[in-house]
């Protein structure tokens, strides 16, 4: 049901987007303008030097985000936030903490991609901090085009990255996992399928084998991070910052850099950099989660969810439902029950049940 709704949403939204772009262009430039736009999309759908083509491509992906959230809601899979985390919502506090490792990786990627500290890179420090025009050539776009592209990237790319995370590491992984009764098998299959599908759907972008391995490695480690943190927050940030940096560095359209070359579509060096930085990001997120004592548990079907402090009548963070039904497999509760005047006289009112940790 949810998948059918998403497919329908995607088809209708793409038709609307196509009409919104092609009709005005056809009216102003005639049939040749429409043909040129089609050719531009076919040759470089994510060309950062063409704001029209780039915005069309990004918007066509961004619309998937509200689509998947509505699909989950309409299909009654659960609240829309069920894809966000084990708390059925975006954990904004945890998201803020994840900015630390995200910015560290962004800084490392900036140094690597610009070749900051070696000859022949995009940026030179010889006599000052400036673009190395001898290596990358001159910008081929106007200031107005560059400004438009940067605004589009900053506004749309975070939602584009979030849409892909919610589709692949949220909906697809949870759906596949729910089909398999053996939890460990379901988890492995969910990670494998989501990673393979994520990588294969990037083939139309022109990636070669190394480029697909690059994307696949990114997707695999992102899937593991989602399982380890119980949510999409860390991977959405990682995905967004990674894509923003790529687009920003390419936006000037440097004359000395051929984005259609074989090396631009993937190299073994690029794959190793992505693999290394992704593993480093996972490690930093793991340490941060342990330090912050991140709650990666998920509530059972009967468990109530509260915004803010847990009410006194709920009996504390570990809930005891009627007849012993509540959260699943928690350690026995030793603290006093709600409403007890004397902790020494307090005793559990039911068999303790609680929460299961995420893998």
Predicted segments, located by residue:
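Transmembrane helix-loop-helix hairpins at the membrane interface
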Residues: 149-309
């Amino acid at each position: 049901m949810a998948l059918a709704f998403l497919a329908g949403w995607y088809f209708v939204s793409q038709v609307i987007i196509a009409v919104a772009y092609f009709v005005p262009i056809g009216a102003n430039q005639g049939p040749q303008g429409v043909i040129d736009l089609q050719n531009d999309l076919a040759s470089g759908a994510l060309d950062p030097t063409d704001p029209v083509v780039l915005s069309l491509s990004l918007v066509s992906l961004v619309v998937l985000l509200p689509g998947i959230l509505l699909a989950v809601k309409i299909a009654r899979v659960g609240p829309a936030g069920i894809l966000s985390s084990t708390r059925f919502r975006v954990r904004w506090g945890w998201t803020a903490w994840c900015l630390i490792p995200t910015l560290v990786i962004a800084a490392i990627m900036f140094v690597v991609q610009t070749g900051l500290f070696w000859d022949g890179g995009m940026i030179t420090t010889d006599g000052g901090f400036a673009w190395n025009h001898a290596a990358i050539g001159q910008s081929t776009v106007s200031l107005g085009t560059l400004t438009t592209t940067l605004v589009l990237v900053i506004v749309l790319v975070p939602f584009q990255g979030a849409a892909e995370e919610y589709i692949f590491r949220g909906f697809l992984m949870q759906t596949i996992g729910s089909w398999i009764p053996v939890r460990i098998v379901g988890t492995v299959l969910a990670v494998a399928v989501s990673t393979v599908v994520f990588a294969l759907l990037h083939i139309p972008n022109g990636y070669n084998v190394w480029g697909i391995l690059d994307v696949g490695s990114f997707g695999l480690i992102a899937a593991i991070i989602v399982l380890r943190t119980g949510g999409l927050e860390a991977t959405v940030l990682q995905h967004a910052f990674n894509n923003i940096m790529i687009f920003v560095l390419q936006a000037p359209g440097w004359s000395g850099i051929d984005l259609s070359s074989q090396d631009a579509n993937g190299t073994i060096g690029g794959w190793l950099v992505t693999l290394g930085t992704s593993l480093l990001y996972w490690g930093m997120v793991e340490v941060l989660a342990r330090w912050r004592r991140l709650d990666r548990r998920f509530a059972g079907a009967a468990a109530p969810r509260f915004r803010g402090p847990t009410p006194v009548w709920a009996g504390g963070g570990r809930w005891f439902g009627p007849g012993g039904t509540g959260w699943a497999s928690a350690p026995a509760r030793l603290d006093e029950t709600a409403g007890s005047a004397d902790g020494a006289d307090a005793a559990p009112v039911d068999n303790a049940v609680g929460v299961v940790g995420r893998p």
